[in-house]
A protein has these predicted regions:
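Short alpha-helical segments enriched in small residues
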Residues: 1-174
Length: 174
């Protein structure tokens, strides 16, 4: 399920968080977030909604590689081989978050928000996302242009869009 911002461009983060809450209630889902470059922005958006404690118990901000390993169970070999900004790392992040929290659906985000830190392989604005649970994950790589703040805000939106799209798909809505 590849996500494009185009189809969601007019939906605010607040509206996405509200829709996420409705979708969680409709499906009985609980959600978690394992965040790196967004620094807790997804958890903040979710918990801005009154009653979000019904479906959001915990989130993880694992900015350093050591935190990814300690909090989420990301393997040292994964980080050494693929790096923090990779499909493999976000898969392990979301699996660990769901395993630890018991959530039925999670999102993991790791990227290069800038202004420095980019490379030819992973330029500034490269963000990897994984949605899923401790058994199965879907990953997507997106290039989100802009300043550090713009990249981070766009990543929060994309993370929420992915959660909403997956839950609304489960409940039969498109």
């Amino acid at each position: 399920m590849a996500i494009t911002l185009e189809e969601w461009r007019d939906v605010s983060v607040d509206a996405l968080a509200e829709r996420l809450g409705k979708a969680c209630r409709a499906t009985g889902a609980s959600v978690t977030a394992a965040e790196s470059c967004t620094g807790g922005g997804v958890a903040s958006a979710i918990t801005d909604v009154a009653g979000s404690s019904d479906y959001f118990e915990t989130g993880y901000v694992a900015y350093a590689n050591s935190a990814k390993q300690r909090l989420l169970g990301v393997r040292e070999a994964t980080l050494a081989t693929h790096g923090a900004v990779s499909a493999e790392t976000v898969r392990e992040m979301v699996a660990g978050a769901c395993r630890d929290s018991g959530a039925t659906l999670g999102v993991a985000i790791s990227g290069v928000a800038g202004p420095g830190g980019g490379s030819a392989d992973k330029p500034v604005g490269t963000v990897w996302f994984a949605w899923g649970d401790d058994r199965a994950q879907e990953v997507e790589r997106h290039h989100l242009p802009g300043t550090r703040g713009e990249v981070r805000r766009a990543a929060v939106r994309m993370a929420l869009i992915g959660l909403v799209a997956r839950l609304e798909g489960e409940s039969g809505r498109d």
